[in-house]
Amino acid sequence: MLDIAPVTLPNVLGVLALFTYIVTLLPTNLRVVFPSSRRTKIPTQLLKYRRWIGILAFLIALAHAYLLVIKRSYDFLDLKTYFIYFPGLASFLILIVLTITSNQWSVKKLKKNWKRLHQLTYWAMFLLCWHIFGTMLGHGSYLTFLGIFGITLIILLYLRRRWIEAEKQKVKEQKLQA
């Protein structure tokens, strides 16, 4: 049977970091999947502040990780620790790289590579889903279910967006061949 655990501060911070991160993924996905959303100011405003929201997501994730390490006193010399927490650690490392390069100087220096580097955010999205399922399923709080719902929704939006973009590309190529 599913046991619902009490809500702890690290869990609250984890879910808050997750939803803040999801907000950074929304603008592009909304604009492609729901073209009528362009008329509203929501995607535009989210796009305008996306870097700052992403940095906030990183800082909240940092607090989440810090509190968990202190609370559970992990043995970092044990390989099982890395195996169990690999998805969370990998997504955290991706967030570190994205946060460090979320400035105009990095955009100018990295040029096309900056955009490629920031495509890692989609890997983090899948890793976070794995992290939530792997570490929380079976003993999570009600916040865990909100997190699972949120990350699943953004993954579905992303997959739909990729499908729409692939279809548009296919039509474009067919027009060029004709």
Language-model regions: role of each:
Residues M1-A178:
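Membrane-embedded alpha-helical bundles that constitute the cytochrome b-like, heme-associated redox core
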